[in-house]
Amino acid sequence: MKYDLTITPTPEKAEVSVTMREDHGADIYDITITSDEPVTGVKLSFHIPAGDIAGRWFPRMKMFDKGVHNSWEGATWTNFTGGAPLVSFYRSDDRNRLTAALSDCKAAWALNIGVDDRTKCLEFIAETKKVSISSESNKYTLSLFIDASTEGTSPDGSKLCDMTTMGARNERYWWESVRAASDFMASFCPSHRLPDFAFDPVFSSWYSFQRGIFADKVLEQCGMAYDLGCRTLILDDGWQTTPGVEDYSCAGDWTPNRDKFPDMKGFVDKVHAIGMRAMIWIGPGLCGDASKLSKLYGDKKIPGGWVLDPRFPEVRARMTEDVCRAAEKYGFDGLKIDFLDSFQGGDVRPENADGRDYLSLTDAVDDMARLISRRLSEISPDFLIEYRQNYTGPAIMANANMIRVGDCPQDYLTNRVGSIDLRLHTHAAVHSDMVQFNPDEPVEVSALQMVNILFCTPQVSVMFDQISEEQRQMLKFWLGFMSEKRELLQKSELMPHRCDANYSYVTARNDEEELHAMYSERLLMLDKPRKRVYIVNGVDRKPLYVGSNEKLTAHCRILDCTGREVKNETITIDCSPARVDVPMCGMAVIDLVI
């Protein structure tokens, strides 16, 4: 083997067989563990030389700590509803140093990954004490993805990995390796149908109204949202609550509050008449103490929690009916399914099952999610299902076609990092957290919320009649541009440079066009540019500089953050970078002269 791979099964007497193959541009180790008694866990590890490591990427929300870390300082956990067993270490030149991933995305993995200061090696240690098997089995299979960049030796001089036959793929960028690892993990899971309208801009009621939503008020905002470019409404939390209730004490009673929505079916019909699809928020499993649901199922909650225990078959049936009623009775086109990461707790033993037909909480949540997805797909094969960070792994995402950045109101940095992270390791339509801003702030400051989410589907949650006319024009421009250029921005090659600097500039390109979003960098050197180049100034009011190793002549239009043209000129781009005065949150549109 190319790597000093150690595998320790539970039970320890189990037999382990390993075969290696190349796929997804990496080394894949297929591991089979067999035993005379049930296989319950496994620990595996390998190491490579710890040279040229600039930082670490990991698919969990708000992972601003890009440090390399020590392998002994504590585990990072992933499970079915939290992240994915995937990690990447990148070099100072944005190239991949090591990317590793596991095929089992249901198991709870403890990942100890980092530098061992004693051996000066980069260690990967993954352990699960409960493999994801619904019923105990004497056989367990697991595949390990390894993509490392250089040949090296350990301190005692022995060779750690033989990379001499791996060729040019060792020089790919870290994000290319992460995407390959994501494809590898997804190959073990079914995929969900993904309609193009899952990428349509969204108006969400949450930040606009909180729980104080009423049918007529939402419809007023929908009309304005449609005029600005939104094509989907998400009716968020509050449609089911009594006015004035600001907590989850009544959560679980998923019927419309008649003071707010006296005719929910009629409301959905009016949203459709405006020209928008309608989605509705729901948190399956939530069971507040003051809810009617608690009186029926209060003894079937997860111990110590505020959610129902889906290991009871009647609980799964009730949650499925509650969720599907919104589509079947009211005509909604999609669901925003929240709080799936609240199903946390230990497994139970057979003698303590007490009517549960699953011992594993993970398997019960998986069964419930698959049942809901299947029922909704029977209603419409293109039914929209939105999940949220952190339940983003390929196993659970097999049941959804939209994934949203976790809540980060007015935090455009988290929205930028979160949306890029989701683009790299999921295969659904990635949505931003809802954009909101202060109606009294300068329009270019408000526009920071938009230009930082260019590479995902925008969700907006403002009161459109309470913002300035300039802010409305800004939204109309960027929503229109992002919708028109979705093939470039969301479905083409994505290059998020400088992960250690929270993606200081990001590039998307296809055969005809490319876009560069400059978030910290001021100098852009074009390399074999496409016919049209967009450059977005996401920094401040200072100028940008554009250069190239070959002499280029181009027409350059400068737009401000509302889309208004402020300059139109012919420029020369060469090894002496040209100054391009792009306003804050504006854009340069450069057409090369052939």
Where are these regions (language model features)?
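Glycine-rich, aromatic-flanked loop segments that form ligand/cofactor-binding clefts
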Residues: 173-190, 232-237, 259-304, 382-386, ...
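N-terminal accessory beta-strand-rich subdomains and adjacent acidic, glycine-rich linkers
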Residues: 1-185, 189, 415, 548, ...
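Catalytic domains of carbohydrate-active enzymes, especially glycoside hydrolases
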Residues: 217-241, 329-333
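Aromatic-lined carbohydrate-binding surfaces of glycoside hydrolases
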Residues: 206-207, 228, 236-261, 280-307, ...
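The substrate-binding groove and active-site-proximal loops of carbohydrate-active enzymes
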Residues: 200-216, 248-262, 302-320, 350-365
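Hydrophobic faces of well-ordered beta-strands that scaffold small-molecule active sites
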Residues: 199-205, 233-235, 278-282, 335-337, ...
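Active-site-adjacent "subsite" loops/lids of carbohydrate-active enzymes
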Residues: 198-200, 207-211, 269, 277-330, ...
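Active-site-proximal substrate-binding groove within the catalytic cores of carbohydrate-active enzymes
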Residues: 147, 152, 156, 368-584
